[in-house]
Protein backbone atom coordinates (compact mmCIF):
# COMPACT_ATOMS: atom_id res chain seq x y z
CA UNK A 1 0.00 0.00 0.00
CA UNK A 2 2.84 2.38 0.84
CA UNK A 3 4.60 1.86 -2.49
CA UNK A 4 1.34 2.14 -4.42
CA UNK A 5 0.50 5.43 -2.74
CA UNK A 6 3.94 6.87 -3.49
CA UNK A 7 3.68 5.67 -7.11
CA UNK A 8 0.28 7.32 -7.43
CA UNK A 9 1.93 10.75 -7.35
CA UNK A 10 5.19 9.79 -9.01
CA UNK A 11 3.24 8.51 -12.03
CA UNK A 12 0.96 11.55 -12.25
CA UNK A 13 3.51 14.36 -11.95
CA UNK A 14 6.86 15.14 -13.53
CA UNK A 15 9.99 14.20 -11.60
CA UNK A 16 11.09 17.83 -11.86
CA UNK A 17 7.70 19.39 -11.06
CA UNK A 18 9.15 20.89 -7.88
CA UNK A 19 12.79 21.08 -8.91
CA UNK A 20 14.69 23.79 -7.07
CA UNK A 21 11.89 24.36 -4.56
CA UNK A 22 12.88 24.37 -0.89
CA UNK A 23 10.03 23.01 1.18
CA UNK A 24 10.05 22.85 4.96
CA UNK A 25 8.06 19.88 6.22
CA UNK A 26 6.85 20.05 9.82
CA UNK A 27 6.82 16.32 10.57
CA UNK A 28 5.91 16.22 14.31
CA UNK A 29 4.26 12.84 15.03
CA UNK A 30 2.36 12.53 11.74
CA UNK A 31 2.05 8.91 10.62
CA UNK A 32 2.60 9.84 6.97
CA UNK A 33 5.66 12.03 7.51
CA UNK A 34 8.13 9.74 5.74
CA UNK A 35 5.79 8.98 2.85
CA UNK A 36 5.05 12.66 2.24
CA UNK A 37 8.77 13.45 2.32
CA UNK A 38 9.45 10.75 -0.27
CA UNK A 39 6.66 11.95 -2.56
CA UNK A 40 7.89 15.55 -2.52
CA UNK A 41 11.50 14.50 -3.08
CA UNK A 42 10.41 12.30 -6.00
CA UNK A 43 9.00 15.43 -7.62
CA UNK A 44 12.35 17.19 -7.31
CA UNK A 45 11.83 19.24 -4.15
CA UNK A 46 14.48 19.89 -1.54
CA UNK A 47 12.66 18.82 1.61
CA UNK A 48 13.83 20.10 4.98
CA UNK A 49 12.22 18.06 7.77
CA UNK A 50 11.71 19.84 11.09
CA UNK A 51 10.06 19.13 14.41
CA UNK A 52 10.04 15.34 14.23
CA UNK A 53 8.71 13.76 17.41
CA UNK A 54 8.04 10.26 18.72
CA UNK A 55 5.55 11.74 21.18
CA UNK A 56 2.07 12.53 19.88
CA UNK A 57 1.60 16.21 19.08
CA UNK A 58 -2.02 17.28 18.53
CA UNK A 59 -2.29 19.55 15.51
CA UNK A 60 -5.50 20.19 13.61
CA UNK A 61 -6.05 22.16 10.42
CA UNK A 62 -9.39 23.36 11.81
CA UNK A 63 -7.84 24.46 15.08
CA UNK A 64 -4.68 26.35 14.16
CA UNK A 65 -3.69 27.96 17.43
CA UNK A 66 -1.75 31.20 18.00
CA UNK A 67 1.22 29.02 19.01
CA UNK A 68 0.97 27.14 15.69
CA UNK A 69 0.87 30.41 13.79
CA UNK A 70 3.89 31.77 15.63
CA UNK A 71 5.79 28.57 14.88
CA UNK A 72 5.03 28.82 11.17
CA UNK A 73 6.27 32.41 11.14
CA UNK A 74 9.45 31.35 12.94
CA UNK A 75 10.08 28.62 10.37
CA UNK A 76 9.69 31.13 7.55
CA UNK A 77 12.24 33.43 9.18
CA UNK A 78 14.66 30.59 9.92
CA UNK A 79 14.62 29.29 6.34
CA UNK A 80 15.05 32.22 3.96
CA UNK A 81 14.30 31.35 0.37
CA UNK A 82 11.81 28.62 1.24
CA UNK A 83 9.00 27.94 -1.19
CA UNK A 84 6.50 26.63 1.34
CA UNK A 85 5.94 24.97 4.69
CA UNK A 86 3.74 21.89 4.67
CA UNK A 87 2.45 19.42 7.22
CA UNK A 88 -0.44 17.11 8.01
CA UNK A 89 -2.40 16.28 11.12
CA UNK A 90 -1.53 13.23 13.20
CA UNK A 91 -3.17 10.62 10.99
CA UNK A 92 -2.10 12.47 7.83
CA UNK A 93 -5.46 13.00 6.16
CA UNK A 94 -5.68 16.75 6.79
CA UNK A 95 -3.17 19.00 5.01
CA UNK A 96 -1.40 22.13 6.14
CA UNK A 97 -0.17 24.47 3.42
CA UNK A 98 1.72 27.52 4.66
CA UNK A 99 3.14 30.06 2.24
CA UNK A 100 6.62 31.57 2.07
CA UNK A 101 5.61 34.25 4.58
CA UNK A 102 4.54 31.72 7.19
CA UNK A 103 0.82 32.31 6.61
CA UNK A 104 -1.46 29.28 6.93
CA UNK A 105 -4.17 28.86 4.29
CA UNK A 106 -7.44 27.28 5.36
CA UNK A 107 -8.59 24.00 3.90
CA UNK A 108 -11.71 25.37 2.23
CA UNK A 109 -9.63 27.86 0.25
CA UNK A 110 -6.95 25.26 -0.41
CA UNK A 111 -9.67 23.11 -1.96
CA UNK A 112 -10.56 25.91 -4.36
CA UNK A 113 -6.91 26.23 -5.44
CA UNK A 114 -6.73 22.50 -6.14
CA UNK A 115 -10.01 22.62 -8.02
CA UNK A 116 -8.69 25.43 -10.20
CA UNK A 117 -5.86 23.11 -11.27
CA UNK A 118 -8.02 20.01 -11.82
CA UNK A 119 -10.81 21.82 -13.74
CA UNK A 120 -13.62 19.44 -12.76
CA UNK A 121 -17.19 19.29 -14.03
CA UNK A 122 -18.62 19.19 -10.52
CA UNK A 123 -17.55 20.04 -6.97
CA UNK A 124 -19.05 19.13 -3.60
CA UNK A 125 -17.88 20.63 -0.34
CA UNK A 126 -19.04 21.30 3.18
CA UNK A 127 -21.58 24.00 3.95
CA UNK A 128 -19.14 25.46 6.49
CA UNK A 129 -16.78 26.65 3.74
CA UNK A 130 -16.51 30.40 3.32
CA UNK A 131 -18.26 32.07 0.41
CA UNK A 132 -15.04 33.11 -1.34
CA UNK A 133 -15.01 29.52 -2.58
CA UNK A 134 -18.53 29.87 -4.01
CA UNK A 135 -17.61 33.13 -5.71
CA UNK A 136 -14.53 31.66 -7.32
CA UNK A 137 -16.25 28.51 -8.62
CA UNK A 138 -19.06 30.62 -10.06
CA UNK A 139 -16.49 32.75 -11.87
CA UNK A 140 -15.01 29.55 -13.32
CA UNK A 141 -18.45 28.17 -14.24
CA UNK A 142 -17.91 25.05 -12.14
CA UNK A 143 -21.19 23.59 -10.80
CA UNK A 144 -21.10 22.90 -7.07
CA UNK A 145 -23.24 21.84 -4.14
CA UNK A 146 -22.90 22.38 -0.42
CA UNK A 147 -23.17 19.26 1.70
CA UNK A 148 -23.58 18.49 5.36
CA UNK A 149 -20.29 18.29 7.22
CA UNK A 150 -18.53 14.96 6.74
CA UNK A 151 -16.93 13.05 3.88
CA UNK A 152 -19.83 10.55 3.49
CA UNK A 153 -22.08 13.40 2.35
CA UNK A 154 -19.47 14.63 -0.11
CA UNK A 155 -18.99 11.14 -1.52
CA UNK A 156 -22.75 10.75 -2.01
CA UNK A 157 -22.95 14.11 -3.79
CA UNK A 158 -20.11 13.16 -6.14
CA UNK A 159 -21.73 9.82 -6.94
CA UNK A 160 -25.12 11.36 -7.58
CA UNK A 161 -23.73 14.13 -9.80
CA UNK A 162 -23.03 11.83 -12.75
CA UNK A 163 -20.18 14.16 -13.71
CA UNK A 164 -17.19 12.91 -15.69
CA UNK A 165 -14.80 14.77 -13.38
CA UNK A 166 -16.26 14.98 -9.89
CA UNK A 167 -14.30 16.15 -6.88
CA UNK A 168 -14.92 17.24 -3.33
CA UNK A 169 -13.23 18.48 -0.19
CA UNK A 170 -13.75 19.32 3.44
CA UNK A 171 -12.97 22.50 5.36
CA UNK A 172 -10.07 20.66 6.98
CA UNK A 173 -8.48 20.47 3.51
CA UNK A 174 -8.89 16.74 2.92
CA UNK A 175 -9.57 16.25 -0.81
CA UNK A 176 -11.61 13.52 -2.49
CA UNK A 177 -11.43 12.37 -6.10
CA UNK A 178 -14.70 10.85 -7.24
CA UNK A 179 -13.47 10.14 -10.76
CA UNK A 180 -10.24 9.70 -12.69
CA UNK A 181 -8.30 12.88 -13.43
CA UNK A 182 -5.82 13.03 -16.30
CA UNK A 183 -2.64 15.05 -15.83
CA UNK A 184 0.10 16.16 -18.20
CA UNK A 185 2.25 13.22 -17.12
CA UNK A 186 -0.31 10.52 -16.43
CA UNK A 187 -3.44 10.27 -14.36
CA UNK A 188 -4.84 10.11 -10.85
CA UNK A 189 -7.29 7.29 -10.27
CA UNK A 190 -10.40 7.88 -8.15
CA UNK A 191 -9.76 8.09 -4.42
CA UNK A 192 -13.06 8.94 -2.71
CA UNK A 193 -11.59 9.28 0.74
CA UNK A 194 -9.97 12.20 2.52
CA UNK A 195 -6.47 12.74 1.13
CA UNK A 196 -3.93 15.26 2.43
CA UNK A 197 -1.18 14.71 -0.12
CA UNK A 198 -3.14 15.68 -3.23
CA UNK A 199 -3.91 19.25 -2.07
CA UNK A 200 -0.35 19.73 -0.85
CA UNK A 201 1.19 18.54 -4.11
CA UNK A 202 -1.26 20.33 -6.40
CA UNK A 203 -0.91 23.67 -4.60
CA UNK A 204 2.87 23.49 -4.85
CA UNK A 205 2.88 22.28 -8.46
CA UNK A 206 0.28 24.84 -9.53
CA UNK A 207 2.34 27.71 -8.14
CA UNK A 208 5.47 26.30 -9.77
CA UNK A 209 3.75 25.96 -13.16
CA UNK A 210 2.60 29.57 -12.95
CA UNK A 211 6.06 30.70 -11.79
CA UNK A 212 4.49 32.45 -8.83
CA UNK A 213 4.62 32.29 -5.06
CA UNK A 214 2.09 30.47 -2.91
CA UNK A 215 0.91 33.74 -1.41
CA UNK A 216 0.19 35.09 -4.89
CA UNK A 217 -1.50 31.84 -5.89
CA UNK A 218 -4.03 32.21 -3.08
CA UNK A 219 -4.62 35.87 -3.93
CA UNK A 220 -6.98 34.81 -6.74
CA UNK A 221 -9.62 34.25 -4.06
CA UNK A 222 -11.80 37.05 -2.72
CA UNK A 223 -10.39 38.08 0.69
CA UNK A 224 -12.34 36.69 3.60
CA UNK A 225 -11.54 36.80 7.29
CA UNK A 226 -12.52 33.58 9.00
CA UNK A 227 -11.27 31.50 11.88
CA UNK A 228 -12.12 28.24 13.60
CA UNK A 229 -11.01 26.59 16.80
CA UNK A 230 -11.96 24.45 19.74
CA UNK A 231 -13.48 25.45 23.07
CA UNK A 232 -11.79 23.30 25.66
CA UNK A 233 -13.53 21.78 28.69
CA UNK A 234 -16.99 22.77 27.43
CA UNK A 235 -19.66 20.90 29.47
CA UNK A 236 -21.22 17.95 27.64
CA UNK A 237 -24.67 18.83 28.92
CA UNK A 238 -24.50 22.28 27.34
CA UNK A 239 -23.13 20.97 24.05
CA UNK A 240 -25.97 18.44 23.81
CA UNK A 241 -28.49 21.21 24.41
CA UNK A 242 -26.99 23.29 21.61
CA UNK A 243 -27.03 20.34 19.20
CA UNK A 244 -30.66 19.56 20.04
CA UNK A 245 -31.71 23.19 19.56
CA UNK A 246 -29.97 23.50 16.20
CA UNK A 247 -30.84 20.06 14.80
CA UNK A 248 -33.06 20.02 11.74
CA UNK A 249 -34.69 16.91 10.33
Please give the residue ranges for each predicted region.
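Gly/Ser/Thr-rich active-site loops/lids in small-molecule metabolic enzymes
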Residues: 45, 49-51, 103-121, 186-202
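Buried hydrophobic positions in well-ordered alpha/beta secondary-structure cores of metabolic enzymes
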Residues: 23, 68-73, 86, 91, ...
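Active-site glycine-rich loop that binds ribose-phosphate moieties when present
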Residues: 2-14, 68-71, 146-152
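Short acidic, glycine/serine/threonine-rich loops at helix termini
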Residues: 34-39, 59-63, 95-101, 117, ...
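Solvent-exposed alpha-helices and their adjacent loops that cap or buttress functional pockets
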Residues: 13-18, 76-80, 88-89, 96-97, ...
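N-terminal small/polar loop signature for handling phosphorylated ligands or for N-terminal nucleophile
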Residues: 36-100
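Phosphate-binding and adjacent anionic-ligand microenvironments
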Residues: 82-84, 120-249
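Gly/Ser-rich phosphate-binding catalytic loop and adjacent alpha/beta segment
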Residues: 1-58
